[in-house]
Amino acid sequence: MTVEQFYEFCLVNRDLRIERTASGEVIIMSPAFSDTGNRNGKIAVQLGNWAEQDDTGEAFDSSAGFTLPNGAIRSPDVSWIKLERWNALTEEQKASFAPICPDFVIELRSSSDTLKGLQKKMQEYIDNGVSLGLLIDRTNRKVYIYRPDREPEILDNPETVSADPELPGFVLRMAKIW
């Protein structure tokens, strides 16, 4: 499916969670289960509050789709983009699946997600320009930290996860996410 066809498909199916792979394959996902949506909200609030105070970037929830350099259109559970990069986009670009890869992404594994599938998605984000990615695996109480040119760092049952130095001062509190 082309980008234009994908956009039209999304407009007609606003109630679906849809992504597009780099090869044009359309992935239709079920809505998040209530508990996952609640935890995604808690993560988005923490990042959003930090972003408002820090004022160096814009935070996004899972409803935002981005066109990555490889052509995939992805919607991370939570993401953040440096203000100068976001402001470099035209208003028309911002009002679509913006052609930009976030600087920071978080994916929260739900019971319908496979760990392997999310790990592949996190690597795709890194390969397309993400500076820092967090994969939160509630089932096993692990956080996988992704950075370019490194193997993922794995934290076992952390109370907090620091996003330094990429997002100075942002610390994700895990108590209400587990």
Where are these regions (language model features)?
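Gly/Pro/Ser/Thr-rich low-complexity, intrinsically disordered segments predominantly at protein N-termini
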Residues: 1-178
